[in-house]
């Protein structure tokens, strides 16, 4: 049975594969679309196995928020050329839409969820591997929830943030917070949420610097505590200077909207080196 251009177009729409890959799969399967899809999928699996040790350092990072739930999804690949491909971005968007709709608990659950055609996200990623010949992986799935939420995607689709709040917040103020997180990369909302190993590391560094500077040993702990407080001001969100107005901390800026307004959590993911 001859393969028609209509058959090729139909399989291409189903699989996202290239025209020649679709033509070859249809010829090999004698125009059986189910078998042709399996041929394309197996090609993707073979490519994935060959390229499993490659680094997927490029990709597309997107985020969204709705009704107090916000999520980030990152689909990674090897080259910027593929990352900017419309079908790659569309797949990332479809994965994000599914995450927003189903709210899975982790990456594994997200990969197992179906897209509109009934095939899993994992299968769709494998199919794209076969099309592009590049390693691809779901690099991140992060989410946060609260009484209200916000998302931000930095131009270029390499960095995204989400944040959640304890009460309703004006949109521009929420967006300012999401952009602050993107720009200043805080490690936590509050000092008490900073990991203990980071605290210990900062104290040790401060003590060593003071000792090298010839400070008396009986003052080292006090100097180290002062350095730690400076670290908190620079690296915990509520204590950071607001990038749009350095006279205000983020906490003070939030209180211009409501005296009880605060950030309950945030997530940030980037493909760039900070």
Curated annotation (Swiss-Prot):
Source taxon at top rank: Bacteria
Keywords linked to the UniProt accession: Cytoplasm, Elongation factor, Protein biosynthesis
Keyword presence, Cytoplasm: yes
GO cellular component, one term: cytoplasm
Primary location class: cytoplasm
Annotated spans, Involved in Mg(2+) ion dislocation from EF-Tu: 79-82
Molecular function in Gene Ontology: translation elongation factor activity
Pfam families on file: EF_TS (PF00889)
PROSITE patterns named in the record: EF_TS_1 (PS01126), EF_TS_2 (PS01127)
Subcellular location: Cytoplasm
HAMAP family named among the record's database cross-references: EF_Ts
Similarity-based family: Belongs to the EF-Ts family.
PANTHER family with a match to the protein in the record: ELONGATION FACTOR TS, ELONGATION FACTOR TS, MITOCHONDRIAL
NCBIfam families hit by this protein: tsf
Purpose of the protein: Associates with the EF-Tu.GDP complex and induces the exchange of GDP to GTP. It remains bound to the aminoacyl-tRNA.EF-Tu.GTP complex up to the GTP hydrolysis stage on the ribosome.
Protein name: Elongation factor Ts
Species of origin: Porphyromonas gingivalis (strain ATCC BAA-308 / W83)
């Amino acid at each position: 049975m001859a393969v028609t251009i209509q058959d090729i177009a139909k399989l291409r729409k189903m699989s996202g594969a290239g025209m020649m890959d679709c033509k070859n799969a249809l010829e090999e399967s004698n125009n059986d679309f189910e078998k042709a899809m399996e041929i394309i999928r197996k090609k993707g699996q073979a490519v994935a196995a060959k390229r499993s040790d490659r680094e997927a350092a490029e990709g597309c990072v997107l985020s969204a928020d709705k009704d107090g739930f916000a999520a980030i999804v990152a689909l990674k690949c090897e080259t910027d050329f593929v990352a900017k491909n419309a079908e790659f971005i569309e797949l990332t968007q479809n994965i994000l839409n599914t995450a927003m709709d189903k709210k899975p608990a982790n990456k594994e659950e997200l990969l197992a969820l179906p897209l509109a055609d009934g095939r899993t996200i994992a299968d769709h990623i494998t199919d794209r591997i076969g099309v592009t010949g590049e390693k691809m992986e779901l690099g991140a799935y992060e989410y946060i929830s609260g009484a209200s939420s916000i998302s931000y995607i930095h131009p270029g689709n390499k960095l995204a943030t989400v944040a959640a709040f304890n009460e309703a917040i004006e949109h521009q103020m929420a967006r300012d917070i999401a952009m602050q997180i993107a720009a200043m990369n805080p490690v936590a909302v509050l000092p008490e949420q900073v990991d203990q190993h980071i605290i210990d590391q900062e104290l040790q560094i401060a003590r060593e610097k003071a000792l090298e500077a010839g400070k008396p040993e009986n003052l080292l702990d006090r100097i180290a505590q002062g350095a730690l407080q400076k670290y908190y001001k620079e690296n915990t969100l509520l204590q950071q200077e607001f990038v749009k107005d350095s006279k205000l901390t983020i906490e003070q800026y939030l209180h211009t909207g409501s005296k009880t307004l605060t950030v309950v959590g945030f997530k940030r993911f980037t493909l760039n080196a900070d």
